[in-house]
Regions:
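Repeated scaffold domains used in trafficking and secretory/extracellular systems
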Residues: 87-101, 134-143, 177-184, 229-243, ...
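A short beta-strand motif characteristic of beta-propeller blades
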Residues: 72-90, 125-131, 167-175, 219-230, ...
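Beta-propeller domains
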Residues: 49-87, 111-125
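Bacterial Sec-dependent N-terminal signal peptides
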Residues: 1-40
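Short coil/turn segments that connect the beta-strands within blades of beta-propeller domains
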Residues: 42-44, 105-107, 145-147, 188-190, ...
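Short loop/turn segments immediately following the C-termini of beta-strands
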Residues: 51-53, 61, 112-114, 152-155, ...
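Short loop/turn segments immediately following beta-strands, especially the blade-tip
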Residues: 60-68, 162-167, 209-219, 261-268
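Intrinsically disordered, low-complexity segments enriched in Gly and acidic/Ser/Thr residues
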Residues: 233-235, 239-310
């Protein structure tokens, strides 16, 4: 296995099944009647979790052919040389989440996979903290104090592990949330955005958690004033809305939405209710980038992921207004999650 290899431009800039109601869908991205020559797309590099190669892979959106050697600017998987145990290496299946964050002028990445999580130095890929954790981990976020937040869809919890206390720290605090799928730190409101189901009412929700206590003994408390019931079931992704700190991207099995932190309401995203979107974000230009499983597209793409029904070989690009622009296809890939590689919290 290889270390993370990143070009100089990149630094400037989740595989687990979603086991909930992952049925077939007849909605497909609108395609232009005329096939145009692929265009380079400016913006941050894109991180993809690839179950086929069992690697986190970094791609340059300015390169139009992602099967070309210069398209993939970085890749990572755990190795003993990087400081990981044999158990962690064997469990890593390509990732379910990957976020790059800069803290005190040092850049790290937080990542999750089905049954392990880690914080690594970026771009070296060296282990900072890691742990084998059951529960079908779907999302990870590095907190400004060095701790790590995790969401487990089968474990039905949000946890904060005290990674700030050492590379092998196993202390954590837990907030019960059924089918938990996403964690995202908000530096303005100083809270953690999460998606899942209310344990008591079974409602599908987006909500915010305050992190109190100390770095060594954190506490999680829901900020109920920010809770919103999702318009459709099975919340999945929560990501930053580049260019507007008052908004968030939120996806579910039934559609994708924009959450307004002031009004505490959800509205339909410009892409107009695509379903089963596993990862979604926008570039500073406003361009939208997302991934949907090939199994949920009709017709299914000729080049597609045949290994499972929750991944894809295709990354789709849309204008800020929701018009399909084009795609990048990687032969043999099984991408589950896409992340805009912006190291800044927002």
């Amino acid at each position: 296995m290889k270390k993370l290899i990143i070009s100089g431009a990149v630094l400037c800039a989740t595989i687990a099944a979603c086991s909930k109601n992952n049925g077939n869908d007849t909605t497909a991205p609108p395609k232009p009647s005329i096939v145009n020559t692929p265009e380079p797309y400016p913006g941050f590099p894109l991180a993809l979790t690839n179950g086929a190669t069992k690697q986190i892979e970094i791609y340059d959106p300015m390169v139009t052919d992602w099967n070309a050697a210069n398209a993939k600017t970085g890749r990572w998987s755990p190795t003993t040389t990087l400081g990981f145990s044999t158990d962690e290496i064997n469990r890593f299946g390509g990732g379910t989440d990957f976020k790059v964050r800069t803290i005190n002028s040092i850049t790290y990445a937080a990542l999750a996979d089905n049954s392990m999580a880690a914080i690594i130095a970026y771009p070296s890929g060296q282990r900072v903290w890691s742990k084998v954790i059951s529960g079908n981990l779907h999302s990870a976020e590095l907190l400004p104090n060095g701790n790590i937040a995790l969401a487990a869809s089968d474990g039905n919890w949000i946890r904060v592990y005290t990674a700030s206390q050492g590379a092998n720290s196993s202390t954590y605090t837990e907030f019960p949330l059924a089918a938990a799928h996403a964690v995202l730190w908000d530096p303005q409101l100083r809270c953690l955005w999460v998606t899942g189901r209310d344990v008591a009412t079974k409602a599908h929700i987006l909500t915010a958690l305050a992190i109190g206590g100390t770095d060594a003994a954190p506490e999680l408390t829901e900020l109920t004033q920010y809770r919103a019931t999702l318009p459709t079931a099975w919340g999945h992704e929560v990501s930053a809305y580049q260019g507007n700190k008052n908004l968030l991207w939120v996806t579910t099995n039934g559609g994708e939405y924009v959450y307004n932190k002031t009004t505490k309401t959800l509205s339909m995203a410009p892409t107009n209710n695509l379903t089963f979107v596993k990862g979604m974000g926008n570039q500073p230009s406003g361009q939208l980038v997302l991934v949907r499983p090939d199994a949920n597209k009709n017709p299914r793409p000729q080049i597609s992921c045949s290994a499972n029904d929750w991944s894809t070989s295709t990354i789709d690009f849309y204008t800020a207004g929701g018009q399909w622009q084009g795609s990048r296809v990687v032969n043999g890939a099984c991408f589950y999650k896409v992340k805009i590689l912006d190291a800044n919290y927002q």
